[in-house]
Amino acid sequence: MRDVKDTLRALVRIGYDGRVFKTFRGPKAGERFANEVRVLRHLEAAGCPFVPRLLEADPEEPRIVTTNCGSRVEHLDEARRAELFSELEKYGVRHDDADKRNVTYRQSDGRFCLIDFEFATILPGFEKKPDGAAT
């Protein structure tokens, strides 16, 4: 595995098969893990095509495994960055860390993608009730 991020809050590695392994560390690791899992599941259910898909979630570690959304973007126009994060809100999520470091480029389909949802918020009106209906 190749380390791509090693900080006090997270260790992110890319496996030889391309999957992304993110282990949460530090303060409130369990809460950040639970939030990222919840947001990724919401985005998948909403059909958002430009975020990773959650493949595994282990609350004991706490660790998630996701699909790979490409490589980090080195240069990105400020207007385009803002547009990407704004587009996410159409799927009911505010990223809450709208920095360039959370933008990747997926060469397979030529698409910019967004990653790292541990601080994201599901917007009012998009929350699901236990029966699956939106509030």
Residue ranges and their predicted role:
Residues 1-42:
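ATP-binding glycine-rich loop module of kinase domains
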Residues 11-13, 54, 102-104:
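Short acidic loop-to-beta-strand element that houses the catalytic metal-binding Asp/Glu
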Residues 17-18, 62, 101, 110:
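Beta-strand-connecting loop/turn residues
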Residues 25, 29-33, 41-84:
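Conserved structural core of kinase catalytic domains
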Residues 76-80, 89-96, 101, 106-135:
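C-lobe/activation-segment region of protein kinase-like
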